[in-house]
Regions:
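Residue-level marker of positions within ordered structural domains that often coincide
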Residues: 25, 53, 80, 155, ...
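A conserved SF2-helicase RecA2
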Residues: 163-220
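SF2 helicase motor core recognition
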Residues: 95-100, 121-125, 134-183, 202
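Conserved Helicase C-terminal RecA-like lobe
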Residues: 1-148, 213-220
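Short catalytic-loop micro-motif centered on adjacent basic/acidic residues
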Residues: 87-88, 111, 157-158, 186-188
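Generic, ordered loop/turn and secondary-structure boundary motif
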Residues: 1, 52, 57, 149-151, ...
Length: 220
């Protein structure tokens, strides 16, 4: 069956918009002082994705939560329209837990991330494939990017993009593989030009290098 990739535009909440503009302003100042190193660029890219998800990590790994209500609302709308099972990918532990708390109010949901032991993961995967519940898996894509067959799902939603191409491409293959009987859909949620450019580069298997600099120069 065919696999379709869909882009879904969402808005930033006022709190996210404020954080995004502040970071963009800081980027411009930083770029004016001298070159942005590769390590700095990776950290800044991660910070942008945290703003998009609504969970910003501080210097000591403390988490500052900001509202991402429009993104969560869009996810719920997608889930209401989906008849088969669904996988939601989010790259940060705090966001995975937040989504689990929100979605379990209305759906049977399991979490897969680095905190879940291998035996428990396998039990979740077996139930997902063979039983009515869980209907939803919320996962860190890095923990589900290789070897699994999860064709009980027909839809994957990226709550925000990963910046790792191999992880993205392999995670999408969990539902688009032999044994799948439904048309499959990959939905990319994005609120900023940076997110859209990350998705474009993921699909094209291009490097993320220079992304932050392009933002600092006003090209994104």
């Amino acid at each position: 069956p065919p696999c379709t990739v869909q882009s879904r535009d969402v808005e930033l909440s006022p709190e996210q918009n404020k954080a995004y503009k502040e970071m963009k302003r800081d980027l411009v100042l930083q770029a004016a002082k001298g070159p942005i190193t590769a390590a700095n660029e990776a950290a800044l890219r991660l910070k942008l994705l945290q703003i998009s998800c609504g969970a910003i990590y501080g210097a000591n790994r403390e988490i500052h939560h900001v509202s991402a209500a429009p993104r969560l609302r869009a996810l719920r709308e997608i889930m209401e329209q989906c008849r088969e099972k669904i996988i939601v990918f989010a790259g940060f532990t705090s966001v995975v837990h937040m989504l689990h708390r929100e979605l379990k109010k209305d759906y049977s949901v399991e979490v897969i991330n680095g905190e879940v032991p291998a035996k428990a993961r396998n039990e979740v995967f077996a139930a997902f494939m063979a039983a009515e519940h869980p209907r939803v898996i919320v996962a860190d894509p890095g923990t589900m990017s290789h070897g699994l067959t999860l064709t009980a799902a027909s839809t994957i939603v990226w709550y925000a993009p990963t910046d790792r191409t191999e992880t993205y491409l392999q995670a999408n293959k969990r539902i688009d593989r032999p044994g799948q009987v439904h048309a499959t859909t990959i939905v990319q949620l994005a609120a900023t030009p940076v997110e859209r450019e990350i998705y474009r580069r993921l699909e094209a298997n291009e490097t993320m290098q220079g992304l932050v600099l392009a933002m600092a120069k006003g090209k994104l």
